[in-house]
């Protein structure tokens, strides 16, 4: 859980990382108390490891079509002061737009996602740190808090006079997609848990595996999403402003702006043989925070999930531990299922 330090595995992106610029607006209120949405007052040393994880958010399915749009409403327990930091940010940057990403998706809809480059967005920075170790009750509280924040933010952006007019007008024309998540009030029922626990197996994927030693003897698929971590904390700076810490902006190829392809090794989804022999882990894989920031996306999980299913079937057929299946036959079976295993 959390982030390895920079020296621990020789990863240049590890630990606390400050790729975003500090914001020179007051982040404190009465008696210099941090405003809501500030997670701390101590600036972590660059490269220091800790328990923190990247922010969670909801992926919103939105629409601008009046015939398929449900307007944002004032949520229960709404307090506009929770978004005072947004007010001050917009006052300092009145030409700023909507603070989250909108991606066109089929059906004339929009996918609303936390903006990795935004200073403030739909991600509730710093309020998910205890999720990995939490029980069901605490996880539900975290889920509820994220929903409350998100619904409140959408309403705030649409109605608060401190929000620039161009943003309020755009928000008035946006709404939840009427034909999505109807049983849940058109709000997505699943929280986007970008990162939680990670396994430590016999092979531990690191930054070097993503960017340098990209070929492996036991590939189960190809990953290519850039190393991409969202904010882990938002801190008051010594001058009273704030800085977001933890974002790793995507490292892309210079040629086509895409991620760098690398082989995903089978060993990264198998536990240590001394600990467990009948488990495959294609999501919370054996990887550092930095490496996981690349492999943590659905295309990679689908590839690893299918390969894990085939491996599980072979372990049963061969009556052996998952670590000991016949790798030659495994590779051939993956190819019959059209898994891409080579970089060329």
Regions of interest found by a model, annotated:
Residues 1-344:
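Flavin (FAD/FMN)-binding glycine-rich loop and adjacent Rossmann-like elements that form
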